[in-house]
Amino acid sequence: MDSELFKLMATQGAFAILFSYLLFYVLKENSKREDKYQNIIEELTELLPKIKEDVEDIKEKLNK
């Protein structure tokens, strides 16, 4: 009986360790991905005034 209980605890322990490792790995990767998305958003936000200016220039040329 004791050996069966020990085997059960060891098995659950391995799954718990694996689950914890995968959980923290996924959280870390998601954090990296979020940082990349924030950088992309910043770059696009910086480009927006230039795009707006170009669109206004095109509108002016079309209205002439």
Swiss-Prot record:
Matches recorded under Pfam families: Holin_BhlA
A GO biological process held by the record: killing of cells of another organism
Coiled coil, from the record: none
Lineage top rank: taxon: Bacteria
The entry's keywords: Antibiotic, Antimicrobial, Bacteriocin, Plasmid, Signal
Signal recorded as keyword: yes
Induction: By UV irradiation.
InterPro entries from the UniProt entry: Phage_BhlA/UviB (IPR024405)
Signal peptide residue numbers: 1-16
Role noted for this protein: May have a role in bacteriocin secretion or immunity.
Protein name stated in the entry: Bacteriocin UviB
Organism whose genome encodes this protein: Clostridium perfringens
